[in-house]
Swiss-Prot record:
It catalyses: guanosine(46) in tRNA + S-adenosyl-L-methionine = N(7)-methylguanosine(46) in tRNA + S-adenosyl-L-homocysteine. The active site is at residue 149. One of its GO terms (cellular component) is tRNA methyltransferase complex. It comes from Aedes aegypti (Yellowfever mosquito). This is tRNA (guanine-N(7)-)-methyltransferase.
Length: 245
């Protein structure tokens, strides 16, 4: 069971920039964390109360527009930073050591590539509880749910990151025309996510042609560390993208 941290220990500020990329073996942690557990997090009461400049040196009066929910070790987040240098993307990760790794990774990338990767950051938080504390209504253009915890037991399905109640929150922070991207190697979870999102009145599923035309559809497959692992294990990958209407 994950040990609780004091509020100060849950700081989202990364350690001083390392001189080389961190190694994952020093940040190992269990694959998933209980989202219902009473962890301690720093979070703003209102989005206006949050100082995004602590993460993004050049953000100025701009806002974060991409959110990678459960960003893992940050592979896809880094890809977003490279593909969209003029957009600000945040990864939200509940696990302590994993979020520490992503923060240190970003700091190292910035130091090794001057002027780059200043548009991505990671925050340790529970997005299932505090998403609307960070984002205004209609703020986000894209949300990503890559290989979320499948919570296989039926009694734990209510903990899945895609459910009817949370979809209303995602709809709130997404702008009209904004997109939700999902990918998993678990067919049952894929069908669950598609069923719940398609049944929600705020969303419609993209056609196969629309998915293929999206510049990120291929990146969903192998940019993340989990995606690479599934590829190595020759597993299936199920992709679906949804638009807020």
């Amino acid at each position: 069971m994950e040990v609780e941290e004091s509020k100060n220990d849950a700081s989202v500020v990364a350690s001083p920039a390392p001189t080389k990329l961190p190694q994952k073996r020093f940040y190992r942690q269990r694959a998933h964390s209980n989202p219902i557990a009473d962890h301690s997090f720093d979070y703003p009461i209102h989005p206006d109360d949050y100082d995004w400049s602590q993460h993004y040196p050049t953000i100025g009066d701009k806002r974060v527009e991409f959110a990678d929910i459960g960003c893992g070790y940050g592979g896809f987040l880094v890809t977003l930073g490279e593909m969209f240098p003029d957009k600000f993307a945040v990864g939200m990760e509940i696990r302590v050591k994993v979020s520490d790794y992503v923060m240190d990774r970003i700091q190292a990338l910035r130091k090794l590539n001057e002027g780059q990767y200043e548009n991505i950051a990671c925050i340790r938080t529970n997005a299932m509880k505090y998403l609307t504390n960070f984002f205004h209504k209609g703020q986000l253009e894209k949300m990503f749910f890559l290989y979320p915890d499948p919570h296989f037991k039926k009694a734990k399905h209510k903990w899945r990151i895609i459910n009817s109640a949370l979809l209303s929150e995602y709809s709130y922070v997404l702008r009209q025309g904004g997109l939700i991207y999902t990918i998993t190697d678990v067919k049952d979870l894929h069908e669950w996510m598609c069923k719940h999102i398609e049944q929600h009145p705020a969303f419609e599923r993209l056609t196969d042609d629309e998915v293929k035309a999206d510049v990120l559809s291929e990146k969903l497959l192998d940019s993340s560390e989990e995606g690479k692992k599934v590829t190595r294990n020759k597993g299936d990958k199920f992709v679906a993208i949804f638009r807020k209407i």
